[in-house]
């Protein structure tokens, strides 16, 4: 009967699950877009603007956030309280990402070539928007954990 009750909780939240799945699919789309933009930025622009290290750190933070989402999914099945705790960790990462994003946009605006500046700014914004989508997924998992 416990298995039936667990499935019942998921059925009641199927709309939330579907929206979460669509949002996760959007994250994959952001990854593709960011990779395309990064491949078109000249290496000399990255070095001269001193954004290479910052960009690496920003991407690492988002990757950490994605790993946290993976941990949340795994813990939903066994310990919903742990899922909520992990989701709070993603909120901390999101705040770090926002701070780094703002600093990087200001640095990117100093790039002298307009096309390179716009491409860099779009890349940074894409990474930040992907982090926002990760936060949306995390929030959905909190709702799901509370209902289980």
Map each language-model feature to its residues.
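Cytosolic, long alpha-helical scaffolding segments
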Residues: 1-148
